[in-house]
Amino acid sequence: MLIKGGHVVDPKTNTNGIMDILVEDGIITEIGKDIEISNGDIIYAEGKLVLPGLVDAHCHLRDPGFEYKEDIETGTMSAAMGGFTSIACMPNTDPVCDNKAVVKYIINKAKQDGYVNVYPIGAISKGQKGEELSEIGELKFAGAVAISDDGKPVKSSSLMKRALEYSSMFDIAVISHCEDLDLADGGVMNEGYWSTVMGLKGIPSAAEEIMVARDIILSEYTKVPIHIAHVSTELSVELIRNAKKRGVKVTCETCPHYFVLTDEACKDFNTLAKVNPPLRTRRDVEAVIEGLKDGTIDIIATDHAPHHADEKNVEFNLAANGMVGFETALPLAITYLVKPGHLTISQLVEKMCVNPSKLLGINKGTLETGRSADITIVDLNEEFVVDVNKFKSKSKNSPFHGFKLNGSVYYTLVNGNVVVREKVLL
């Protein structure tokens, strides 16, 4: 197969220009100008961007246990439509992904039903109860790419310290959901003007920041890397920026909703904008964008969190936290980061391909010859209107319905197989 005449961008190989890509037996074998083939599929990519397949370091596939929200088949269909070729799924399933049986189940089901590469993340604590460490070696050898109790914080500092020590033995990333539950205290949105106007219990930004500070200190103390999930506040960004300057091995991610939306999106009790950590203020949004620009924030993840309509169609206090993200993440990043000049395409590829692969220790996120052909082809300028009813995800809980965005995904190739062709899932 030949991908012809597209604008290829891959910071890992310092590629940024009009090139052809030759794919043979699912492997990238040549990148250069004017490559010819006598027979085989030719994809004409003139006027489009050709990027390494996107890698999502943080999503929820809800399988096993919550298949009424999403399963591995529908989740990976949605990922493919959004240009993602590799995704890492969080362990808050039922049963929790805290042992090799669940890891193997996810890997095998993804091989059977999956449209993209799926990598399980194991739980830090058994049952995500925060009491006893999972068998981290067992998780790693079964195929887990990281450990996290995402959805819940690790409340005990000594348990988190031990998790870091074990993670360094087994060379596996630790991803921390930073939330002080005592401070969050049952809040349902960001504490501020809008929570006051709506009469809802607020979550102070300090609930995130205190745990970010703790985890930075534990990482510094143990000399083991830590990765902070879904950073949403100005002070969190500042704490991580300062820690990096001191040489602490801390990395972090944010999600599109934290650089696009503020807590005003919750007005009129819009449960589609209810998420954890909550949407913050304009000042926080600007700080997150600044953190992306200066490299403090390494990764853009989706935190794709599908919920059944019935779980959102209730009073704000009772609604589930989270939003689907696969099919809007790249267009939101293009529209709100690349178009205004905050990031170049090359920097965006670092945050959505190169750095997530590095965190998870997987051989993805680049178009190097010899690598499997995971490739995403995007029209940077094409404008479209988000329609949640067209999402391939089982769940449609997105606050972005009706948004005008740039950046349509035209093709997604996974291991050399075309799974999305001309914006249609095959």
Curated annotation (Swiss-Prot):
Chain sites annotated for binding Zn(2+) 2: 150, 177, 230
Gene Ontology CC annotation, any one: cytoplasm
Gene3D superfamilies: Metal-dependent hydrolases, Urease, subunit C, domain 1
Positions of the catalytic residues: 303
One family name in Pfam for this protein: Amidohydro_1
Residues noted as binding substrate in the record, renumbered to the chain: 60-62, 92, 276, 307
UniProt entry tagged with the keyword Phosphoprotein: no
This enzyme's EC code(s): 3.5.2.3
UniProt binding sites for Zn(2+) 1: 58, 60, 150, 303
Record keywords: Hydrolase, Metal-binding, Pyrimidine biosynthesis, Zinc
Catalytic reactions of this protein: (S)-dihydroorotate + H2O = N-carbamoyl-L-aspartate + H(+)
Pathway recorded for this protein: Pyrimidine metabolism; UMP biosynthesis via de novo pathway; (S)-dihydroorotate from bicarbonate: step 3/3
Gene Ontology MF annotations: allantoinase activity; dihydroorotase activity; zinc ion binding
Highest taxon in the source lineage: Bacteria
Cofactor details (free text): Binds 2 Zn(2+) ions per subunit.
Enzyme kind, highest EC tier: hydrolase
Record function comment: Catalyzes the reversible cyclization of carbamoyl aspartate to dihydroorotate.
The family this protein is said to belong to: Belongs to the metallo-dependent hydrolases superfamily. DHOase family. Class I DHOase subfamily.
Protein name: Dihydroorotase
Organism: Acetivibrio thermocellus (strain ATCC 27405 / DSM 1237 / JCM 9322 / NBRC 103400 / NCIMB 10682 / NRRL B-4536 / VPI 7372)
